Amino acid sequence: MAKISVLGSGSWGLALALLLHNNGHEVLLWSARPENARKLREKRENPDRLPGVRLPDEIDVLTDLERALKDVDVTVLAVASPYIRSTAHKMASFVCRDQKIVNVAKGIEEKTLKTLSEVIEEEIPQGNVAVLSGPSHAEEVGRGLPTTCVISAHTQETAEYLQSIFMSPVFRVYTTPDILGVELGGALKNVIALAAGTADGLGYGDNTKAALITRGITEIGRLGKKMGAQMETFYGLSGIGDLIVTCASKHSRNRKAGYLIGQGYTMEEAMKEVQMVVEGVYSARAAREIAEKYEVEMPIITEVNRVLFERKSAAEAVMDLMLRDKKVETPMLPWENA
């Protein structure tokens, strides 16, 4: 049995705290907001984030970060991506050397263009940072529905240890050494999901969504390969797997925000309506800047940025994607008669 602290009392933090408790571990749950912590202690449920899922009495809900991190074996960082750096900064003085920190947020820091694990390592250099990602909506994990994810770490030993911590009959975990690929897949799929939701909002069909998913993973993989990630990762759980579920699921806040934009909402109105952090909005601009830095063509992500930040109409953005110059789908494959 391990002692585990889950930082963040949103839907994902609650779902993972319950999973880890059911796996037989001692679990602490930390909330940055005293009022949220008080309600969780009293009601043992967060009806706004994860209705119908009860938090066991054995899980202590804390607001004292030092106490939450004292003598723990693993820390699960389940705060939204815009708050990763500030939370990691607060954690730094309480984290012992080589303490395992599992980041489960998905995004890119807009100001620095760093992945979230890079941000955490910058703030907590003594930590041993890993990443858990994949097609895993909290609403389903919290209900115990079968889910499969991937965990990536700097060493095989750490990855396999964490794999054993999270594995259960309803939560299967694979391992990979490709931290960069796992993080890029998790962050950039949110931007593609905004596009897929926008297409739904415009009334387009399954053909359109399939095209966005397929060409979207091609864009993500193209950038990832240029940055040093492994192409194989993008065809796995943290790439195409996460992209499919985020583009198609009713639980996806990124798809929902995109849908509202397709219906005519502004970005600000859509984010307010969703009432949760829409990670794709924060990652979109960073993704475009990274693509420009590495000179990688990413037309879908470019058009998403134009809709979000330049007030381009969603219908016009789709039309511009359709009217791009003719391309070969598989440029690396030779023609027999060439």
PLM regions and their residue ranges:
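Alpha-helix C-terminal capping/helix-to-coil transition sites in glycosyltransferase folds
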Residues: 70-71, 188, 240
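Internal alpha-helical scaffold of NAD(P)-dependent oxidoreductase catalytic cores
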Residues: 83, 94, 119-127, 146-232
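NAD(P)+-binding Rossmann beta1-loop-alpha1 motif at the extreme N-terminus of oxidoreductases
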Residues: 1-53, 60-63
